Amino acid sequence: MHRFKPFLTAILALGLSGCTAMAGEGRSPATYANPVLDTDFPDPAVLKASDGFYYAYATQTGKGAATLNLQVARSRDLVEWKLLGDALPNKPVWARGTQDFWAPHVSEHAGRYYLYYSAKPDAALTDSARGLCLAVATAVRPEGPFTDIGRPLQCGTGFVNIDPMAFDDPETGKRLLYWGSGFGPIKVQELGPDRISFASGSKPVDLVHPAPSEDPAEYGRLIEGAWLVRRGGWYYLFYSGDNCCGPKAHYAAMVARSRSATGPFETRALPAGAPGNVVVGQRGIWVAPGHNSVIEDARGDHWIVYHAVDSRRPRSSEGDEVNTRRIMLIDRLVWRGGWPEVEGSGPSSGPRPRPVVR
């Protein structure tokens, strides 16, 4: 989830495209250090495109006098990233007057790119009962520009319809869409062959439910940001909770697993359907890490790509008490007993071996 309130909306600032963001210190040709993208880049979703580049997509942000609806960056190695600008430069016709464009995910099929995201419809400006919508846009290039299909995929109340992630299940051949928040469960539903609508007769299935707790070590009050990975006969559902932003941000990435892409899911410590099992949590200077994607490198290692807040510079600008500055980090996942972990259970600091890429 992202809460962004721009100070000024304008055309893209001159010179934005092609700029390289500063990243972690202490690197050598064989190492990297977090962050890999030291600019506000919330909810990062990474795609390895057929052109050989990695693309990262992120939630709306402000860059100087400009507002980027959905950000896109490109890399050859998952470490050095170049900001490319706005993947969705033109707002959809049903959300011209709003500013909430969140948590994109892009998939590639038959030479076409599908961008799934969430946005607040114009109707919500006059009707407080209206919440965010799931949406789809398409493009012929991974960097865009993406064009919305002209209608929401699904709308509802509050923040229920956010954080979509598309996944093609190799076992069943089904095209699936995961989403969810708003203090409700993570859901999945089958997409139709066109990938821009739900399959006829399909219904959403609840997968993992929030679990309110007074324990400050727990993160299950609100869960969001689904990402699915298949490995060794298991499907791993990553998700995050429970408060991404603000002075009291309290957030971590978690995981559950299942033998089926549509559940039931279990965690290491709790019964099926309950959240738990933190993969990466607060550590050192890094606060509120989460809302991750996962990408596999050329050696077969899995890397978790996520945002976190640098406690030394937590705000987007001086005097800004609204927008939390969430920057992009990566860490290698290690697998122990069939479960993924990050060494030290939190973001790394200092030099680490780079991902292996071709």
PLM regions with names:
Residues M1-L8:
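Bacterial N-terminal signal peptides that target proteins for export
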Residues C19-R358:
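Carbohydrate-active catalytic/glycan-binding domains of CAZyme proteins
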Residues T9-G18:
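Bacterial N-terminal signal peptides
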